[in-house]
Amino acid sequence: MLLEQQKQLISLIQAAVAQCLPEAQAQVQLERPKVAAHGDIATNVAMQLAKPARRNPRELAQGIVDALMAQPQARELIQDAEIAGPGFINFRLTPAARQAVVQAVASQADAYGRAPRNGEKVLVEFVSANPTGPLHVGHARQAALGDAICRLYDASGWDVTREFYYNDAGNQIDNLAISVQARGRGIAPDAPDYPADGYKGDYIVEIARDFAARKSVQASDGQPVTATGDLDSLDDIRAFAVAYLRREQDLDLQAFGLAFDNYFLESSLYASGRVQETVDTLVAKGHTYEEGGALWLRTTELGTGDDKDRVMRKSEGGYTYFVPDVAYHKVKWERGFHHAVNIQGSDHHGTVARVRAGLQGLEAGIPKDFPAYVLHKMVKVMRGGEEVKISKRAGSYVTMRDLIDWVGRDAVRYFLIQRRADTEFVFDIDLALSKSDENPVYYIQYAHARICTMIGNSGASAAEIAQADTALLTAPSEYALLQRLAEFPQVVALAAQELAPHHVAFWLRDCASDFHAWYNAERVLVDEPALKLARLRLAATTRQVLANGLALLGVSAPDRM
């Protein structure tokens, strides 16, 4: 049922309730019955109102139905209504109401499922990897989730900025530099004098080789960095290694089909004095104290749910990692992004309350729930029934590029989106490569490709299909498919509201299933010209909405398989 139809039906039900219970304030909710035989849409409004009104719920439901069906507008939407169980009202739509989705999709095309621009803007920060190695499968899940959430925001009318925050300051960058230095001097990772916390993947050898060859590299938003070849200068090695890995990560993201609007460097917060300014402000506001030679933030007093106070400045003088995060999010707010979303691994859950506490301590008018967070569990990769743990190039983990090379980016994107972010996910390489109904990407894309082939072989023109009479679409499998297509805008809205693109992934699988069921139940290219065109129009409508849904996930809609 289209959203506009739902709004109209709710208004009509409220008018019917007002006739039965003039004093009642009806909060009408509609839902799709779990069993198709029970109708197209249902409400429990009679059960909600019966007890306070001291009425029998079934009798009240019948009164509401009688008052509803007395309205001419209701009869245009509702074919019949029946009372079920303790007082549910199940509705069956008229054929015209069921078929209205076909014209809605035809008139809106790519815009079907999208909302008007709302004048609001949002910053979504994701991936945000340390420039210390290739992107891994956890970053791939962030990339898939983050880009899909950005696409959902865009579909919901927001102006979206994708941002990548580079943690290019701190001990990990120092470890990267000394690792490259050691490999450049011929020290192997298993040698006793190799850095204890050094990185051991083959990519370290590649960086050392290019550094010695005095090559130049450039990240997508940076100036070229030319290697000096001086292994005694850790500063030179550090600058080249960071630029090298930023470029490598850029290439990984390009292979994924993902482009960021902005890159933000952690080091810039130190260089600009924003980190020190943040600390000074928190001290001046009285939200800190000294203990054991360290500076502590009174996070337990700042109303964000932290269970203990947190160290900001360690006794040796260095800042803990959440301090620049507070400074960074203050900068986000000052840039006018009063709605921001961070997508991070669930191992970062402890930082949520700390960062929000720091922002509250700045007393800058920032809401307590800023920023919003989507925390995801990690990914286990399986192949041939065994877990794949190591990539030779990375040294200790499976890379994002590995996944793309193995199964293609469409499969990577869909598979990493199809489950709730807060659930662990097993990426089955064999399943992603299979050409079977069990592979959801293949199943959905095959539905789209099958429609393209069917229309191409039909001999019908686009104009003929567009003018087909949808009143001929009366088979149960056609009604089921029409109902599914009508749900799409509401699924998009729900996914955007909950920052949960898996809703779209589920819907795509269900829609493909409904299409295949219809295709197997009813011949499309029948001898009767009018019926053939009507069914081709339903197929074309399905193709359009499948393509719209796949686009929200960043997955292609192929014309042939």
UniProtKB/Swiss-Prot annotation:
Biological process according to GO: arginyl-tRNA aminoacylation
- InterPro entries listed in its UniProt record: aa-tRNA-synth_I_CS (IPR001412), Arg-tRNA-ligase (IPR001278), Arg-tRNA-synth_N (IPR005148), Arg-tRNA-synth_N_sf (IPR036695), ArgRS_core (IPR035684), DALR_anticod-bd (IPR008909), Rossmann-like_a/b/a_fold (IPR014729), tRNAsynth_Ia_anticodon-bd (IPR009080)
GO cellular component, alphabetical, reads:
cytoplasm
- Does the keyword field hold Nucleotide-binding? yes
Q: Which reaction does it catalyse?
A: tRNA(Arg) + L-arginine + ATP = L-arginyl-tRNA(Arg) + AMP + diphosphate
Which ranges belong to the motif 'HIGH' region? 129-139
For this UniProt record, give its keywords in alphabetical order, as a comma-separated list. Aminoacyl-tRNA synthetase, ATP-binding, Cytoplasm, Ligase, Nucleotide-binding, Protein biosynthesis
Task: List localization entries.
Answer: Cytoplasm
Q: Which family does it belong to?
A: Belongs to the class-I aminoacyl-tRNA synthetase family.
Subunit organization:
Monomer.
Name of the featured protein = Arginine--tRNA ligase
Natural source organism: Bordetella bronchiseptica (strain ATCC BAA-588 / NCTC 13252 / RB50)
